[in-house]
């Protein structure tokens, strides 16, 4: 199947398996630094605030299929109050490549971190600085939380179309996760087929940099694969999939025309990858008392209040505990 192209204002939308991107020859020149599948760290420093690219001659770019999947359920509506609640971390992305400017979506999940798709970051051709992010963008002239420049990319080691992008602080020395509250991730313990969901992002068939929400239900769920019956188009790649609690349960990648749209489901493997690479990512159950990852959980071995923790003064095996049976312990009344 060949891709189809949609005109968006004076930009164009080009098809990807998982997204349609917008191209404009007005893109800035990129550096020639190379980057493979391994993350490349650049010096963290304040960056000049990027701006949303506008206009440019139409320049279609066919790369992959299945970007625009409009299903019978086409319940999409625009979000105008983009800075409110769980909408705030939803992010408009532009990638400034030598061949043009491409658009996609993402979601802020940490102080300096955003999630999107592998195929979105692939458009940088190895230069993280080519990727710009505009959290809570309202339109191409109004992005209330400014813009940020990427400095490091880490691709998911599994098959899922998922990538982590870290950003430099802006000119005011603010991080992307400080100008908006990062999204809360679901632990997905209760996620199942037929549940109501939304996909929120920046579709390419709508006015540039306008946020839209699509509503539907989960139709399939297995491993890292999630499918649903709602409609999306190119530009939605990297959009967060929210449950009814407004927690992120997956990252949208695209779909198959007349069949389904899909996302990388945040299962245990994906969750472990995210926790290993994003220190401050927040999952909904992290602060629950029975969560073994909660430092306040008395059963957490790293919790000093855990009776089995060697550094717990109440632990009889603690050498500083006067009740310690160690006869060499000067604090032990039975010591010689």
From Swiss-Prot:
Domain of life the protein comes from: Bacteria
The keyword Secreted is annotated on this UniProt entry: yes
Listed Low complexity bias regions: 39-51, 286-336
GO molecular function: serine-type endopeptidase activity
GO annotation, cellular component aspect: extracellular region
Signal peptide feature range: 1-29
GO BP, sorted A to Z: proteolysis
Keyword Signal included in the entry's annotation: yes
Region (Disordered): 34-61, 283-336
List of catalytic residues: 119 (charge relay system), 161 (charge relay system), 237 (charge relay system)
Pfam family, one: Trypsin_2
Region (11 X 3 AA repeats of P-[DN]-N): 289-324
Location in the cell: Secreted
Site, as annotated: Cleavage: 68-69
Sequence repeats mapped onto the chain: 289-291, 292-294, 295-297, 298-300, 301-303, 304-306, 310-312, 313-315, 316-318, 319-321, 322-324
Catalytic activity line of the entry: Preferential cleavage: Glu-|-Xaa, Asp-|-Xaa
PTM per Swiss-Prot/TrEMBL: Proteolytically cleaved by aureolysin (aur). This cleavage leads to the activation of SspA.
Keywords of this entry: Hydrolase, Protease, Repeat, Secreted, Serine protease, Signal, Virulence, Zymogen
Main location: secreted
Annotated SUPFAM superfamilies: Trypsin-like serine proteases
Enzyme Commission no: 3.4.21.19
Residue span(s) of the pro-peptide: 30-68
Family to which this protein belongs: Belongs to the peptidase S1B family.
Function: Preferentially cleaves peptide bonds on the carboxyl-terminal side of aspartate and glutamate. Along with other extracellular proteases it is involved in colonization and infection of human tissues. Required for proteolytic maturation of thiol protease SspB and inactivation of SspC, an inhibitor of SspB. It is the most important protease for degradation of fibronectin-binding protein (FnBP) and surface protein A, which are involved in adherence to host cells. May also protect bacteria against host defense mechanism by cleaving the immunoglobulin classes IgG, IgA and IgM.
Note: The cascade of activation of extracellular proteases proceeds from the metalloprotease aureolysin (aur), through SspA to SspB.
Name the record gives this protein: Glutamyl endopeptidase
């Amino acid at each position: 199947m060949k891709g189809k192209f949609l005109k968006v204002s004076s930009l164009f939308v080009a098809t990807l398996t998982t997204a349609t991107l917008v191209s404009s020859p007005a893109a800035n020149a990129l550096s020639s630094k190379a980057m493979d599948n391994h993350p490349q760290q650049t010096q963290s420093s304040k960056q000049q605030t990027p701006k949303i690219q506008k206009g440019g001659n139409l320049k279609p770019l066919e790369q992959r299929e299945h970007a625009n999947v409009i299903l019978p359920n086409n319940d999409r509506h625009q979000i105008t109050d983009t800075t409110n609640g769980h909408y705030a971390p939803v992010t408009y992305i532009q990638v400034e490549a030598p061949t043009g400017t491409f658009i996609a979506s993402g979601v802020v999940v940490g102080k300096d971190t955003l999630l999107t798709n592998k195929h979105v970051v692939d458009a940088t051709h190895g230069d993280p600085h080519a990727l710009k992010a505009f959290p809570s963008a309202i339109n191409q002239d109004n992005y209330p939380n400014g813009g940020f420049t990427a400095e490091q990319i880490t691709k998911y080691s599994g098959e899922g179309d998922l990538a982590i992008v870290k950003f430099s602080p802006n000119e005011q020395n603010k991080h992307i996760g400080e100008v908006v509250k990062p999204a809360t991730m679901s632990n997905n313990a209760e996620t199942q087929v037929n549940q109501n969901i939304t996909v929120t992002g920046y579709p390419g068939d709508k006015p540039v940099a306008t946020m839209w929400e699509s509503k539907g239900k989960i139709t399939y769920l297995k491993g890292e694969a999630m499918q649903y019956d709602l409609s999306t188009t190119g530009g939605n790649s990297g959009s967060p999939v929210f449950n009814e609690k407004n927690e992120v349960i997956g990252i949208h990648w695209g779909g198959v025309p007349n069949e389904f749209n899909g996302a990388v489901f945040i299962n245990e493997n994906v969750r472990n990858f995210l926790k290993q690479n994003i220190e401050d990512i927040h999952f909904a159950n992290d602060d629950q008392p029975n969560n073994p990852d909660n430092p306040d959980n008395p059963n957490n071995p790293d919790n000093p209040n855990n009776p089995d923790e060697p550094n717990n003064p109440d632990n009889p095996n603690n050498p500083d505990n006067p009740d310690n049976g160690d006869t060499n312990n000067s604090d032990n009344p039975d010591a010689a």
